[in-house]
Regions:
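N-terminal pre-core extensions flanking Radical SAM catalytic domains
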Residues: 1-121, 138-139, 328-390
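Active-site catalytic pocket residues across diverse enzymes, especially alpha/beta-hydrolases
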Residues: 101, 165-169, 244, 275
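Core AdoMet radical
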Residues: 77-89, 98-128, 140-158, 169-195, ...
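Distinct, well-ordered alpha-helical segments
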Residues: 159-163, 194-201, 263-267
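Radical SAM enzyme [4Fe-4S]-AdoMet core and its adjacent flexible, acidic
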Residues: 1-11, 106, 123-128, 202-390
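Conserved RecA-like ASCE ATPase "motif II neighborhood" in helicase/translocase motors
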Residues: 129-133
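Non-transmembrane alpha-helical segments in soluble domains
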Residues: 14-17, 94, 159-166, 238-241, ...
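A general structural signal for short secondary-structure junctions and capping/turn motifs
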Residues: 29-32, 73-75, 136-137, 174-176, ...
Length: 390
Protein backbone atom coordinates (compact mmCIF):
# COMPACT_ATOMS: atom_id res chain seq x y z
CA UNK A 1 0.00 0.00 0.00
CA UNK A 2 1.04 3.59 -0.56
CA UNK A 3 1.53 6.09 2.21
CA UNK A 4 -1.54 8.14 3.03
CA UNK A 5 -2.39 11.09 0.78
CA UNK A 6 -3.36 13.32 3.68
CA UNK A 7 -4.79 16.18 1.62
CA UNK A 8 -7.35 13.79 0.12
CA UNK A 9 -8.39 12.07 3.32
CA UNK A 10 -12.11 11.17 3.30
CA UNK A 11 -12.87 12.99 0.09
CA UNK A 12 -15.65 11.56 -2.06
CA UNK A 13 -14.79 9.24 -4.94
CA UNK A 14 -15.62 11.95 -7.48
CA UNK A 15 -13.48 14.53 -5.67
CA UNK A 16 -10.59 12.11 -5.33
CA UNK A 17 -10.57 10.61 -8.81
CA UNK A 18 -9.77 13.73 -10.82
CA UNK A 19 -8.27 15.86 -8.06
CA UNK A 20 -5.17 17.91 -8.89
CA UNK A 21 -3.11 15.45 -6.85
CA UNK A 22 -4.31 12.35 -8.69
CA UNK A 23 -4.00 13.97 -12.12
CA UNK A 24 -0.37 14.77 -11.36
CA UNK A 25 0.22 11.26 -9.99
CA UNK A 26 -0.95 9.76 -13.29
CA UNK A 27 1.23 12.08 -15.33
CA UNK A 28 4.26 11.39 -13.15
CA UNK A 29 3.78 7.63 -13.25
CA UNK A 30 3.57 7.56 -17.04
CA UNK A 31 6.67 9.80 -17.21
CA UNK A 32 8.53 7.49 -14.81
CA UNK A 33 8.78 10.17 -12.12
CA UNK A 34 8.80 8.63 -8.60
CA UNK A 35 5.76 9.32 -6.39
CA UNK A 36 6.71 10.06 -2.78
CA UNK A 37 3.75 8.11 -1.38
CA UNK A 38 4.77 4.98 -3.35
CA UNK A 39 8.11 4.26 -1.67
CA UNK A 40 7.09 0.77 -0.53
CA UNK A 41 6.48 -0.38 -4.12
CA UNK A 42 9.80 1.04 -5.28
CA UNK A 43 11.63 -0.72 -2.43
CA UNK A 44 10.07 -4.05 -3.38
CA UNK A 45 10.82 -3.65 -7.07
CA UNK A 46 14.49 -2.80 -6.40
CA UNK A 47 14.72 -6.13 -4.56
CA UNK A 48 13.09 -7.96 -7.49
CA UNK A 49 9.96 -8.61 -5.40
CA UNK A 50 6.49 -8.05 -6.86
CA UNK A 51 4.95 -4.83 -5.55
CA UNK A 52 1.23 -4.17 -5.24
CA UNK A 53 1.23 -2.11 -8.43
CA UNK A 54 2.93 -4.97 -10.33
CA UNK A 55 0.37 -7.53 -9.18
CA UNK A 56 -2.57 -5.16 -9.72
CA UNK A 57 -1.63 -4.23 -13.28
CA UNK A 58 -0.87 -7.85 -14.17
CA UNK A 59 -4.57 -8.69 -13.97
CA UNK A 60 -5.91 -5.59 -15.74
CA UNK A 61 -6.25 -6.20 -19.50
CA UNK A 62 -7.75 -2.72 -19.95
CA UNK A 63 -4.81 -0.77 -18.53
CA UNK A 64 -3.36 0.37 -21.87
CA UNK A 65 -6.83 1.45 -23.00
CA UNK A 66 -7.30 3.50 -19.82
CA UNK A 67 -3.90 5.19 -20.27
CA UNK A 68 -4.64 5.99 -23.91
CA UNK A 69 -7.92 7.65 -22.90
CA UNK A 70 -6.26 9.91 -20.32
CA UNK A 71 -6.48 13.66 -21.00
CA UNK A 72 -3.38 15.83 -21.32
CA UNK A 73 -3.92 17.19 -17.80
CA UNK A 74 -4.01 13.66 -16.32
CA UNK A 75 -7.78 13.47 -15.84
CA UNK A 76 -9.91 10.48 -16.79
CA UNK A 77 -13.48 10.44 -18.06
CA UNK A 78 -13.81 6.79 -17.03
CA UNK A 79 -14.26 5.99 -13.35
CA UNK A 80 -12.28 3.37 -11.37
CA UNK A 81 -12.62 -0.24 -12.49
CA UNK A 82 -10.62 -1.63 -9.54
CA UNK A 83 -11.74 -1.23 -5.91
CA UNK A 84 -9.48 -2.10 -2.98
CA UNK A 85 -11.49 -2.03 0.26
CA UNK A 86 -9.79 -2.69 3.60
CA UNK A 87 -11.76 -2.81 6.80
CA UNK A 88 -10.09 -2.19 10.15
CA UNK A 89 -12.47 -4.56 11.96
CA UNK A 90 -10.52 -7.63 13.09
CA UNK A 91 -10.62 -10.47 15.60
CA UNK A 92 -6.86 -11.17 15.70
CA UNK A 93 -3.91 -9.19 17.05
CA UNK A 94 -1.26 -10.63 14.73
CA UNK A 95 2.35 -10.07 15.79
CA UNK A 96 3.25 -8.62 12.38
CA UNK A 97 0.29 -6.20 12.29
CA UNK A 98 -0.46 -2.80 13.82
CA UNK A 99 -3.14 -0.27 14.68
CA UNK A 100 -3.36 1.05 11.11
CA UNK A 101 -4.86 -2.25 9.99
CA UNK A 102 -6.54 -3.91 12.97
CA UNK A 103 -9.08 -2.71 15.51
CA UNK A 104 -7.70 -5.12 18.13
CA UNK A 105 -4.30 -3.45 17.82
CA UNK A 106 -5.82 -0.09 18.71
CA UNK A 107 -6.76 -1.52 22.11
CA UNK A 108 -3.43 -3.36 22.37
CA UNK A 109 -1.54 -0.14 21.66
CA UNK A 110 -3.18 1.54 24.63
CA UNK A 111 -2.66 -1.46 26.88
CA UNK A 112 1.02 -1.94 25.98
CA UNK A 113 2.27 1.63 25.59
CA UNK A 114 -0.48 3.72 27.18
CA UNK A 115 -0.99 5.41 23.82
CA UNK A 116 -4.60 6.44 23.35
CA UNK A 117 -5.41 6.23 19.66
CA UNK A 118 -8.26 8.66 18.99
CA UNK A 119 -9.54 6.53 16.11
CA UNK A 120 -13.32 6.58 15.71
CA UNK A 121 -15.08 4.48 13.09
CA UNK A 122 -16.81 6.71 10.55
CA UNK A 123 -19.86 4.60 9.77
CA UNK A 124 -21.19 7.01 7.16
CA UNK A 125 -17.89 7.01 5.28
CA UNK A 126 -17.81 3.20 5.40
CA UNK A 127 -21.36 3.04 4.08
CA UNK A 128 -20.53 5.45 1.25
CA UNK A 129 -17.56 3.25 0.26
CA UNK A 130 -19.98 0.38 -0.26
CA UNK A 131 -22.37 2.60 -2.22
CA UNK A 132 -19.51 3.65 -4.54
CA UNK A 133 -18.76 0.00 -5.35
CA UNK A 134 -22.44 -0.81 -5.85
CA UNK A 135 -22.88 2.13 -8.24
CA UNK A 136 -19.84 0.98 -10.21
CA UNK A 137 -21.31 -2.51 -10.46
CA UNK A 138 -24.64 -1.09 -11.60
CA UNK A 139 -22.84 0.74 -14.41
CA UNK A 140 -20.76 -2.36 -15.25
CA UNK A 141 -17.58 -0.35 -14.69
CA UNK A 142 -16.02 -2.45 -11.94
CA UNK A 143 -13.87 -5.33 -13.19
CA UNK A 144 -11.97 -6.21 -10.01
CA UNK A 145 -12.68 -6.13 -6.27
CA UNK A 146 -10.13 -6.71 -3.52
CA UNK A 147 -11.31 -7.26 0.05
CA UNK A 148 -8.81 -7.18 2.91
CA UNK A 149 -8.56 -5.95 6.44
CA UNK A 150 -8.67 -6.41 9.26
CA UNK A 151 -10.91 -9.32 8.45
CA UNK A 152 -13.19 -8.70 5.44
CA UNK A 153 -15.73 -11.35 6.40
CA UNK A 154 -16.53 -9.22 9.48
CA UNK A 155 -17.30 -6.15 7.34
CA UNK A 156 -20.91 -5.02 6.85
CA UNK A 157 -19.77 -3.03 3.80
CA UNK A 158 -18.47 -6.23 2.24
CA UNK A 159 -21.71 -8.11 2.82
CA UNK A 160 -23.86 -5.27 1.48
CA UNK A 161 -21.88 -5.45 -1.78
CA UNK A 162 -22.08 -9.27 -1.89
CA UNK A 163 -25.87 -9.11 -1.47
CA UNK A 164 -26.09 -6.61 -4.32
CA UNK A 165 -23.85 -8.71 -6.55
CA UNK A 166 -26.07 -11.71 -5.96
CA UNK A 167 -29.20 -9.75 -6.87
CA UNK A 168 -27.54 -8.51 -10.06
CA UNK A 169 -26.41 -12.03 -10.95
CA UNK A 170 -30.05 -13.17 -11.13
CA UNK A 171 -30.77 -10.66 -13.91
CA UNK A 172 -30.08 -11.71 -17.49
CA UNK A 173 -28.38 -8.43 -18.41
CA UNK A 174 -25.91 -8.75 -15.50
CA UNK A 175 -25.37 -12.51 -15.24
CA UNK A 176 -22.25 -12.73 -17.42
CA UNK A 177 -20.89 -9.42 -16.17
CA UNK A 178 -20.97 -10.44 -12.49
CA UNK A 179 -19.46 -13.80 -13.37
CA UNK A 180 -16.46 -12.02 -14.90
CA UNK A 181 -15.78 -9.55 -12.07
CA UNK A 182 -12.53 -10.68 -10.46
CA UNK A 183 -13.07 -10.80 -6.69
CA UNK A 184 -10.15 -11.65 -4.42
CA UNK A 185 -9.72 -11.76 -0.66
CA UNK A 186 -7.03 -11.57 1.95
CA UNK A 187 -8.70 -13.35 4.88
CA UNK A 188 -7.47 -15.08 8.02
CA UNK A 189 -10.10 -17.83 7.47
CA UNK A 190 -11.23 -17.64 11.08
CA UNK A 191 -14.84 -16.99 10.06
CA UNK A 192 -16.99 -19.62 8.35
CA UNK A 193 -20.48 -18.25 9.13
CA UNK A 194 -22.23 -14.92 8.56
CA UNK A 195 -25.67 -14.42 10.09
CA UNK A 196 -26.22 -18.17 10.50
CA UNK A 197 -25.28 -18.92 6.88
CA UNK A 198 -22.12 -20.61 5.65
CA UNK A 199 -19.81 -18.08 4.03
CA UNK A 200 -18.82 -20.51 1.28
CA UNK A 201 -22.48 -20.75 0.24
CA UNK A 202 -22.87 -16.96 0.22
CA UNK A 203 -19.88 -16.25 -2.05
CA UNK A 204 -19.79 -19.44 -4.12
CA UNK A 205 -21.75 -17.87 -6.99
CA UNK A 206 -18.78 -15.72 -8.07
CA UNK A 207 -15.95 -18.14 -7.18
CA UNK A 208 -13.54 -15.59 -5.69
CA UNK A 209 -9.80 -15.96 -5.36
CA UNK A 210 -9.01 -16.64 -1.70
CA UNK A 211 -5.56 -15.53 -0.57
CA UNK A 212 -5.57 -17.08 2.89
CA UNK A 213 -3.57 -14.99 5.35
CA UNK A 214 -2.13 -17.92 7.30
CA UNK A 215 1.39 -17.77 8.73
CA UNK A 216 2.63 -21.33 9.16
CA UNK A 217 0.83 -24.16 10.90
CA UNK A 218 0.21 -25.45 14.42
CA UNK A 219 2.16 -23.55 17.13
CA UNK A 220 3.81 -21.24 14.59
CA UNK A 221 0.44 -20.14 13.23
CA UNK A 222 -1.08 -19.60 16.67
CA UNK A 223 1.83 -17.40 17.73
CA UNK A 224 2.13 -15.32 14.55
CA UNK A 225 -1.64 -14.96 14.16
CA UNK A 226 -2.22 -14.14 17.82
CA UNK A 227 -5.83 -15.02 18.60
CA UNK A 228 -6.07 -17.75 15.98
CA UNK A 229 -6.71 -21.43 16.56
CA UNK A 230 -4.99 -23.88 14.21
CA UNK A 231 -7.66 -26.57 14.50
CA UNK A 232 -10.41 -24.10 13.52
CA UNK A 233 -8.39 -22.46 10.75
CA UNK A 234 -7.23 -25.72 9.16
CA UNK A 235 -10.84 -26.95 9.19
CA UNK A 236 -12.00 -23.73 7.52
CA UNK A 237 -9.19 -24.04 4.96
CA UNK A 238 -10.51 -27.48 4.00
CA UNK A 239 -14.07 -26.19 3.65
CA UNK A 240 -13.22 -23.05 1.66
CA UNK A 241 -10.86 -25.00 -0.59
CA UNK A 242 -13.49 -27.63 -1.39
CA UNK A 243 -16.03 -24.96 -2.43
CA UNK A 244 -13.92 -22.18 -3.91
CA UNK A 245 -11.30 -23.75 -6.15
CA UNK A 246 -13.22 -24.58 -9.32
CA UNK A 247 -10.69 -22.62 -11.39
CA UNK A 248 -7.61 -23.61 -9.36
CA UNK A 249 -7.63 -20.09 -7.92
CA UNK A 250 -7.26 -20.89 -4.20
CA UNK A 251 -4.12 -19.41 -2.68
CA UNK A 252 -2.13 -18.65 0.44
CA UNK A 253 -0.51 -15.41 1.60
CA UNK A 254 1.94 -16.15 4.41
CA UNK A 255 4.11 -13.44 5.92
CA UNK A 256 7.61 -14.93 5.66
CA UNK A 257 8.68 -14.22 9.23
CA UNK A 258 11.32 -16.12 11.20
CA UNK A 259 8.98 -18.77 12.71
CA UNK A 260 7.35 -19.46 9.33
CA UNK A 261 10.73 -19.89 7.62
CA UNK A 262 12.17 -22.06 10.40
CA UNK A 263 9.02 -24.20 10.37
CA UNK A 264 8.82 -24.40 6.57
CA UNK A 265 8.77 -28.21 6.48
CA UNK A 266 5.45 -28.33 8.37
CA UNK A 267 4.18 -25.55 6.09
CA UNK A 268 4.88 -27.79 3.10
CA UNK A 269 3.48 -30.87 4.84
CA UNK A 270 0.10 -29.18 5.17
CA UNK A 271 -0.23 -26.80 2.20
CA UNK A 272 1.69 -28.34 -0.70
CA UNK A 273 -0.85 -31.08 -1.43
CA UNK A 274 -3.51 -28.43 -2.15
CA UNK A 275 -1.39 -26.81 -4.88
CA UNK A 276 -2.27 -23.26 -3.75
CA UNK A 277 -1.30 -20.15 -5.68
CA UNK A 278 1.39 -18.36 -3.68
CA UNK A 279 0.86 -14.74 -2.62
CA UNK A 280 3.43 -14.74 0.18
CA UNK A 281 4.61 -11.47 1.72
CA UNK A 282 7.82 -9.97 3.01
CA UNK A 283 7.96 -9.36 6.74
CA UNK A 284 8.05 -5.62 7.31
CA UNK A 285 7.94 -3.40 10.38
CA UNK A 286 4.56 -1.69 10.13
CA UNK A 287 4.47 2.10 9.78
CA UNK A 288 8.13 2.40 10.69
CA UNK A 289 7.60 2.06 14.45
CA UNK A 290 10.85 0.72 15.91
CA UNK A 291 9.00 -0.40 19.03
CA UNK A 292 7.03 -2.85 16.88
CA UNK A 293 10.17 -4.58 15.67
CA UNK A 294 10.53 -8.12 16.99
CA UNK A 295 12.37 -11.35 16.37
CA UNK A 296 9.88 -12.13 13.63
CA UNK A 297 12.63 -10.62 11.47
CA UNK A 298 14.80 -13.55 10.33
CA UNK A 299 17.68 -11.14 9.59
CA UNK A 300 18.26 -10.74 13.34
CA UNK A 301 19.61 -14.27 13.66
CA UNK A 302 23.36 -14.98 13.36
CA UNK A 303 24.84 -15.81 9.98
CA UNK A 304 25.08 -19.58 10.45
CA UNK A 305 21.43 -19.90 11.54
CA UNK A 306 20.16 -17.35 9.02
CA UNK A 307 21.94 -19.05 6.12
CA UNK A 308 20.78 -22.50 7.15
CA UNK A 309 17.06 -21.74 7.47
CA UNK A 310 16.74 -19.29 4.57
CA UNK A 311 18.65 -21.49 2.14
CA UNK A 312 16.61 -24.51 3.22
CA UNK A 313 13.38 -22.59 2.56
CA UNK A 314 14.67 -21.47 -0.85
CA UNK A 315 15.56 -25.08 -1.63
CA UNK A 316 12.07 -26.32 -0.65
CA UNK A 317 10.32 -23.79 -2.86
CA UNK A 318 12.78 -24.25 -5.73
CA UNK A 319 12.17 -28.00 -5.83
CA UNK A 320 8.39 -27.62 -5.54
CA UNK A 321 5.92 -27.14 -8.37
CA UNK A 322 3.89 -24.53 -6.50
CA UNK A 323 2.51 -21.76 -8.68
CA UNK A 324 3.91 -18.32 -7.88
CA UNK A 325 6.98 -19.78 -6.15
CA UNK A 326 9.41 -17.45 -7.93
CA UNK A 327 8.25 -14.35 -6.06
CA UNK A 328 8.48 -16.24 -2.76
CA UNK A 329 12.06 -17.20 -3.63
CA UNK A 330 12.76 -13.57 -4.54
CA UNK A 331 11.46 -12.49 -1.12
CA UNK A 332 13.77 -14.94 0.65
CA UNK A 333 16.70 -13.82 -1.48
CA UNK A 334 15.88 -10.19 -0.69
CA UNK A 335 16.42 -11.01 3.00
CA UNK A 336 19.93 -12.21 2.11
CA UNK A 337 20.66 -8.97 0.24
CA UNK A 338 19.35 -6.78 3.07
CA UNK A 339 21.21 -8.67 5.77
CA UNK A 340 24.49 -8.47 3.88
CA UNK A 341 24.00 -4.72 3.46
CA UNK A 342 23.27 -4.15 7.18
CA UNK A 343 25.19 -6.99 8.80
CA UNK A 344 26.85 -4.78 11.44
CA UNK A 345 23.45 -3.52 12.59
CA UNK A 346 21.87 -6.97 12.73
CA UNK A 347 24.81 -8.36 14.71
CA UNK A 348 25.00 -5.47 17.19
CA UNK A 349 24.54 -7.03 20.63
CA UNK A 350 22.85 -4.01 22.22
CA UNK A 351 20.43 -3.80 19.30
CA UNK A 352 19.62 -7.51 19.65
CA UNK A 353 19.03 -7.15 23.39
CA UNK A 354 16.65 -4.25 22.78
CA UNK A 355 14.68 -6.22 20.19
CA UNK A 356 14.54 -9.25 22.48
CA UNK A 357 13.18 -7.03 25.27
CA UNK A 358 10.50 -5.72 22.91
CA UNK A 359 9.63 -9.26 21.84
CA UNK A 360 9.32 -10.38 25.47
CA UNK A 361 7.19 -7.35 26.28
CA UNK A 362 4.82 -8.11 23.38
CA UNK A 363 4.58 -11.70 24.57
CA UNK A 364 3.05 -10.50 27.86
CA UNK A 365 -0.09 -9.53 25.93
CA UNK A 366 -0.57 -12.71 23.90
CA UNK A 367 -4.02 -14.26 23.64
CA UNK A 368 -2.29 -17.65 23.71
CA UNK A 369 -0.03 -19.02 26.44
CA UNK A 370 2.94 -19.86 24.19
CA UNK A 371 5.69 -17.24 23.94
CA UNK A 372 8.16 -16.69 21.12
CA UNK A 373 10.97 -18.61 22.83
CA UNK A 374 8.62 -21.54 23.49
CA UNK A 375 7.73 -21.66 19.80
CA UNK A 376 11.43 -21.55 18.88
CA UNK A 377 12.10 -24.48 21.20
CA UNK A 378 9.56 -26.53 19.23
CA UNK A 379 10.63 -25.58 15.70
CA UNK A 380 14.41 -24.93 15.87
CA UNK A 381 16.53 -25.96 18.86
CA UNK A 382 19.69 -24.18 17.69
CA UNK A 383 17.84 -20.90 17.16
CA UNK A 384 16.18 -21.30 20.57
CA UNK A 385 19.48 -21.81 22.39
CA UNK A 386 21.05 -18.79 20.67
CA UNK A 387 18.03 -16.60 21.44
CA UNK A 388 18.00 -17.57 25.12
CA UNK A 389 21.67 -16.59 25.45
CA UNK A 390 21.19 -13.01 24.18
Amino acid sequence: MSDDIHELKKTSLLEFWNSEKMKQVRLDMIAGTPIKECNRCYEYEKLNVDSLRVTATRYDPNLSKIINNMSEDGSLLSMPNYFDHRTIHCNFQCISCGSFYSSTHINLKKEMWNVDDDFVIDHQYEKQSGIDIIESLNKKECTSLYWAGGEPFMSHVHWSVVDHMYNLSTKDEYKNYIKNVRVHYNTNLSKSVWKNKKIVDLINFYQPSIQASIDGTHETFEYCRDGGNWETTSKNWEEFYSYLNKNRQFGIASVLSSPVIMDIDRWFDFFEKYDPLLYNHRYIVNVGLAKQMSFLDIKLFPTHIFNRVVNHAIDRFSKSELRGKHNTINILESYIIERNERVSEFENNKFLKDIKAQTMNRDKYLKINRTYDQVLKIIDTEAYEWYMNI
